[in-house]
Amino acid sequence: RTEYRRLSHHLYLPMPGGDIAAREPWRMAVSLLYSLYGENMPLPDDFVKRVGEDRIKLVSRMIARRINTPLSSGAGRLFDAVASLLGIADFNRYRSEAPQKLEQVADRSILKIYSFDKDNPLDFSWLVKAVLNDLQKGVPCSEIASAFHRTYAAMWCVELAKQAVRQKLSRVVLC
């Protein structure tokens, strides 16, 4: 008989508007930044122009007051947020469009991996800061998308290795 246990997950993020947040990745971008920075979140100018200050304020209030904001620790919502911050997709016309576009934009020749805390690899605040920093510096979205993907994979490899040793496991599964 096989037994499965959830050993790790990254930060839970509010999904402002519930399922609507999966169709409107900009909501997850606001959620991500609000969760990490609070009301003083660093919003890229281009993002504010595309989405609008009123929408951002409304969603921020929803998160602050915990109104219709179920939590998600799914990778898809994180990828939605990053795709929106990079200006790749603010709205999904079909399921997982933003993460797919983020992957398509990634320049596979870029081997950059952002540095991260190997003792706490699932704390992705450093990853978001690195993405925002590169965005502010004018690094092409294709390079940022590649570094984001590579870093996200690397952090999970570190976490899986840690859990395998800690739990004395010979097999681990990503779900």
Regions found by a protein language model. Give the residues of each.
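Gly/Thr-rich phosphate-binding beta-strand-loop-beta motif of the actin/hexokinase/Hsp70
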Residues: 1-2
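Short beta-alpha connecting loops at secondary-structure transitions
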Residues: 5-21, 43-45, 62-67
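N-terminally biased helix-coil "hinge/interface" segments that flank
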Residues: 25, 29-30
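A contiguous, well-structured pocket-lining segment that forms one wall/lid of small-molecule binding clefts
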Residues: 31-169
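Glycine-rich phosphate-binding loops at beta-strand->alpha-helix junctions
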Residues: 170-175
